[in-house]
């Protein structure tokens, strides 16, 4: 059963501290863990033995990147499944692009900041976290959804082609148009992390990628697409990512699903607070899908981080 603990990745230079959480294998009995404002506002709790000792040694690590204006807890059922399967799972709230702090959500620079934050999370987990001595640094994976999918692809070696996607950035409807007009395209390179050997990418925002963006991607990838899409992601945009990947990958299309199907099934309080992420087509069963999805993600990471050791 999973253990659970909160973490804080320390501030670095001009980068703020990052609040996060870790799930991990544990022998103690789990219980519902109150998450403060998240529980109060949305009725969400996680299942785990809070701050209990970890079970195991040389365990694989999976890091998680959430979507735009979201929260690390929105993938907690997957984290619990992976922890039950022998993985350490670490997630953060991206600075300025999470539910409780949206101050940088509309800034193009946040797309560069996000991969750097996940690299900082990995650094922390391997060197300064209470679980550092139990992690196998040769077995690291990433899960990313939506903007977090863009983050995951970048970490795996993909590079945005700002000039190549100028048509998108300059569209009058683009939230980025004024920023590009005033400041030009981003000038610093996006962060890659060769320590990451496998990635599960769900409905990634792919608007800044072109065919040449993926030349340096060599890791094993499981790519998920919702049939109906949403929030700037379409079935075709995800399929285009798959066609551009230079190595073989595992691809899944979730029939009848919208973009937010990859988020946890909604309880009443969450559905009332943020209804747009909780509405599914009548023919789609999100809880049933998550049982299959979580199992498939676990099997992929077991094959590529455990079995391939």
Q: What kind of feature is each model-predicted range?
A:
Residues 107-138, 150, 154-159, 164-180, ...:
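Alpha/beta-hydrolase active-site loop
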Residues 58-60, 136-138, 193-198, 216-221, ...:
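Short, proline-enriched alpha-helix->beta-strand connector loops that line the catalytic pocket
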Residues 44-59, 64-101, 229-234:
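Short substrate-entry loop that stabilizes the transition state in hydrolases
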Residues 27-48, 164-211, 228-230:
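Mobile cap/lid helix-loop segments that gate and shape the active-site cleft of serine hydrolases
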Residues 19-36, 150-166, 250-271:
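Short, solvent-exposed beta-strand-terminating loops
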Residues 1-62, 270:
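Domain-level recognition of soluble alpha/beta enzyme cores
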Residues 216-289:
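Active-site-adjacent alpha-helix of alpha/beta-hydrolase-fold enzymes
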Residues 142-144:
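Short beta-strand immediately N-terminal to the catalytic nucleophile in serine-hydrolase-like folds
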